[in-house]
A protein has these predicted regions:
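Active-site and donor-binding regions of nucleotide-sugar-utilizing enzymes
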Residues: 12, 17, 70-166, 171-174
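Conserved N-terminal ligand/cofactor-binding loop architecture of enzyme catalytic domains
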Residues: 20-95
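Short helix-capping segments at alpha-helix termini
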Residues: 25-30, 122-127, 166-167, 226-231, ...
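Donor-nucleotide binding loops and adjacent catalytic segments primarily
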Residues: 189-190, 199-260
Length: 260
């Protein structure tokens, strides 16, 4: 079987899930390809969409929150959202790509390609099965206006929420968020700490901020470090946010109990 896995360059979680799916499909001797949907648009579409999203979330999170709330409002209207029509513009290009490469199924780990696939189904340009994988622990706005064959959700407790938004319950599969098979391999705490040059027995606080290093990580780090005692360690993960990483390393480079 040959599977096309669609993602979008808006943060790392969607791409990580797509890569995990590809790795698992390859393990079972299926052919799989990961494609950024926006790469089918104009030359700089992917960079513009991804860059705008990352900037908004990391630099102006209040603006992102406002847009999210607007999405919650728009989803109540009986017609399709502007998000749907924006992604529908890539429908013909995606349909041609699928036909030219003879895929047997298509999976998306992002809402945007699900919107595109929905348009394609409506226009009769999609004849292979399509599956959407939700990578958020909530039914975010606009999933309800998509029409995929199945929806993989992170947990069975989310089925009522997705169903209440209009997605047929028989299409909801509570299989979880895809992760790489490597995470299933057991590893001892002692070996991992030695590998990361961390004290083997000291209490450790781990602070994660997503692939983009967003949020008030610097404030949390300062507050946490001020409360460390008796050799407690703090590990701060900044994702791809190199600016934040450099800033925190500069501030805490003299503290042996803080690892950025």
């Amino acid at each position: 079987m040959k599977v096309l896995i669609l993602s979008c360059n808006t943060g790392g979680g969607h791409n990580a899930a797509a890569s995990a799916l590809k790795e698992s499909l390859n393990f079972y001797h299926h052919e799989a390809e990961v494609l950024d949907l926006m790469s089918l648009g104009r030359k700089h579409t992917s960079a513009l969409v991804g860059g705008a999203y990352v900037k908004l979330v990391s630099v102006f999170p209040a603006g992102f929150g406002a847009l999210y709330q607007l999405g919650e409002l728009v989803r109540k209207f009986p017609w399709k959202s502007p998000v749907y029509y924006a992604n529908a513009r890539l429908g013909n290009a995606l349909a041609d790509y699928i036909d030219q490469n003879h895929f047997n199924a298509v999976v998306t780990t992002h809402l945007y390609p699900a919107e595109t696939l929905t348009w394609m189904k409506q226009k009769g340009r999609l004849t292979i099965p399509c599956v959407a994988v939700a990578t958020d622990y909530a039914c975010i706005p606009f999933w309800e206006e998509t029409n995929c064959d199945y929806y993989v959700v992170p947990h069975k407790d989310l089925i009522p929420e997705f169903a209440s938004c209009g997605i047929p319950e028989e299409k909801l599969l509570p299989l979880g968020i895809p992760v790489r098979p490597a995470f299933a391999r057991p590893a001892s705490k002692e070996d991992v700490r030695r590998h990361l040059d961390l004290p083997e027995n000291a209490p450790l606080f781990l602070v994660m901020s997503g692939s983009m290093g967003f949020g008030k990580v610097h404030l949390l780090t300062h507050e946490l470090v001020s409360r460390l005692e008796n050799g407690e360690q703090a590990v701060i993960i900044c994702g791809n946010n190199k600016k934040r990483m450099r800033s925190l390393r500069l501030q805490f480079h003299k503290n042996p109990n803080v690892h950025i």
